[in-house]
Design a protein with these regions (language model features):
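Short, surface-exposed alpha-helix to beta-strand junction/turn motifs within ectodomains of secreted
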Residues: 71-114, 139-146, 155-159
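Conserved beta-propeller blade signature
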Residues: 25-29
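Short, small-residue-biased leader/transition segments that mark boundaries at the very start
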Residues: 1-8
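Residue-level detector of Asp-centered blade-edge/turn motifs that repeat once per structural unit
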Residues: 20-23
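A short loop-to-beta-strand structural motif that recurs across blades of beta-propeller domains
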Residues: 44-46
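Beta-rich catalytic cores
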Residues: 12-14, 41
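Acidic, Ser/Thr/Gly/Pro-rich low-complexity segments and short DxT(G/T)-type signature motifs
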Residues: 52-60, 77, 95, 132, ...
Length: 168
């Protein structure tokens, strides 16, 4: 049985195929395909059954003209969420080239200059001093808890900013 806090490292091998049945059971087929992968097995077939328990997570990250808006699965602790030090960004991109792979290049450190927590405490709007089109914006969240005092299951989020929205 599983709740949504099952991570790829909890599975036997790298996930390759998923199948959801009518009763909500998920079958996960995995292989490392001769490469390094999460898990300790070269192949796996696992059955997961949903327990109905949703963890405290970042549900969505949306680009705004001056930053990002985060939606959470539960209300946040407004006091911690309002602190600038809770939110740390870095941004970077990769070299487009014909050979395989690329190092991260053009690292930048956007700073959060303003935090707005919605009345229902499920949405947090972060204003940044800079955003770079074409960059991956990597967010790390330090010490944020839900209003029910639960920690974030995953304290990072990534957004590839293909364009900066207008308006709002």
């Amino acid at each position: 049985d599983w709740s949504s806090d099952v991570c790829s490292s909890d599975l036997g091998s790298g996930t390759l195929a998923l199948r959801m049945t009518d009763d909500g059971t998920m079958f996960v087929g995995g292989t490392n395909r001769g490469w390094g992968s999460r898990g300790t097995k070269p192949f796996s077939l696992e059955r997961l059954r949903w327990t109905g328990k949703v963890p405290f997570e970042i549900l969505q990250m949306r680009a705004k003209p001056d930053g990002f808006e985060l939606e959470f699965t539960e209300p946040v602790n407004a006091e911690t969420a309002a602190q600038l030090a809770t939110w740390k960004f870095t941004s970077y991109c990769y070299i487009f080239q014909s050979s395989y792979g690329s190092p991260e290049v053009d690292h930048q450190q956007p700073e959060v200059t303003k935090v707005q927590v919605s009345d229902d405490r499920r949405t947090v709007r972060l204003t940044l001093n800079q955003m770079t089109r074409g960059h991956i914006h990597e967010l790390h969240v330090a010490g944020l808890k839900s209003a029910a005092d639960l920690p974030l299951l995953h304290d990072s989020a990534y957004y590839t900013l293909h364009y900066i929205p207008r308006g709002e």
